[in-house]
Amino acid sequence: MRVVSGTARGCKLQPVPGMNTRPTTDRVKENVFNLIQDHVRGAEVLDLFAGTGQLGIEALSRGAAHCDFVEHNKAAYGIVSKNVEGARVKGKAAIHRTEAA
């Protein structure tokens, strides 16, 4: 799992240990962001059920102004924090440990 494009391109993202999740593949992520690319730069992003934070981090890497990450799971919340720091986007991120539903 990595950041596909932007300022954090190539940054490896840590998975949530012990969780049987299937992260969004790089190909799917790239296709999604190709569709919305005209709306990302300067945007305020909300990454609900953030998991690893990869979608919000990708948006920040591609020029989003800010991202609020929402994750209830304690282990995943910790991984989002680590991944945000590793991608060097901490100044544009707020991470909330709460239910999104």
Q: Where are the model-predicted features located?
A:
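Class I S-adenosyl-L-methionine-dependent methyltransferase catalytic core
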Residues: 1-101
